[in-house]
């Protein structure tokens, strides 16, 4: 039987579900509260638009050396190209040996030079002869007074005074250091004031990158910040896997940063989710205030050489727009582009990045931070009541006895409402908020689809059968259902929105569940309303009886193969969803995504425009033309993917709410277009088959 052949008895007309006006009213009141929170969130997000374009000072030094140019000339060009901050790291003996401001030499090498006659300085020969040169120690001399003073101070802090001894080589002071020479060469030796001065003098801010001390004390912390005094600092981003002061002197770090009103930069993790873990970072952020925290991203060192400049520039624009990154730590390209010098290549990269950010509404300078944003507990509590009402409304639409009893609906609402709202009204309820967000992401898109099913059941005979009117009806239905699903998006955002979620100190849990659960919820409701066996079930039968019949059905090998493919598709669908993907994305899809990013302010999600929304259009066609209900069931479940995805987009709280909103709209518009094309193709297919069948009948 062709799939478009009419199935006259594919729904259960006696099963009429009533929608509680009381519960709907509570949902609407909760929606007002949710929208109030969301509008406030939007204002907070639009006020945070300044991005710090930074690069390592060492990177520009390397670029100058590679091109054989004066450092000042390269710095000036970088400034003109849009760079605002230079990252300055702690100095090391490796760097000091190269710039000649201080030298560390192994005692074994001095002894070797003494014995082979190449150590000619009388003062040093005297130290050897006095037995003051030990082969297992290192000896430090300075050639710049300020640098030597800072190195001496930091060596004593890091190693202790008992491991650093002052010697005299004639009129020159020498430090004898009890340390493994190779380790000493790599040891951090404090923030170099000469580099910070040069950075400021060239017109840049300093992005300070201090590291922690072993058994760090309050005095160590104060010494680090004292060295930063007098310099223009844009942000502090700690180096290594510990913040300065961890674990015992964190309050000193917090106090020093508060005193100087400094911004803490935290490095986004390589998974592009939350942060690179540094001991003490959460305590500093919490006590400093989340309104003094900015997110930093840097394209991985091994990835950047594979990216063309325009691709990298697009990466920066998308990163800052979609993930609330406000410190862009760039790297230099170490190979020139065709027909360009290495300097020209990098200046083009900097300039194009600056221009792309400006085109997207960003200003360039020391990073902005989010204002302290914690919505009213009263608004949030009212929102929670709306979520409770939505949960009860769903239950009433799948449990006939509950649907018939207004009393039990109210009782359930009171119970759920108290459990959800009371902790929030008391100023707590962080876990309840997550559960409310999870419920919003699953229940509201399900209610939207169920509401459509109930509406079209009553209008089945009135639905247009001809293609163009049917297509228009399907598009209108898609937009209306999408608008209803967006109620869930408003609730989800309102339940979670605060500064900690915008910065990703907290994240929504249950992303992968939201791709599956709405289909389950809609599937249950569908089986309560429709006989998927087209008249072979009693009208009084519902979900359980239909599931039993499905389980009792004999299974053929081809059915098993088909189910295996469906299962594989489901695994791929879920694995590629969520904050982190368990499966790679093909190059073809990456190119398709890039095209969408160029065409739209916010790239629509492929699961909406290619899967969910076209299936929605076809489901309307299936219902109007009375295709087999089993096929309608499958299309409705797939259509639910699109509705759930629209809401789930808002679970990525780091993405601005306006961008998430436009992403969903773009998905509906494109998805409706693709769905319309699919409807036309099926219409043509049916026409061709009908012609062929008529021709065969004439023979």
Q: Where do the model's predicted regions map?
A:
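Hydrophobic secretory-pathway targeting helix
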Residues: 2-63, 75, 84
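Non-cytosolic juxtamembrane linkers/loops
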Residues: 327-412, 416-428, 433
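Generic low-polarity alpha-helical segments
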Residues: 1, 6-8, 86-88, 199, ...
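Arginine residue identity/basic-tract feature
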Residues: 18-21, 41, 50, 66, ...
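Alpha-helical transmembrane segments of integral membrane proteins
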Residues: 3-4, 10-33, 385-699
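Soluble extramembrane regions of membrane proteins in the secretory/endomembrane system
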Residues: 42-377
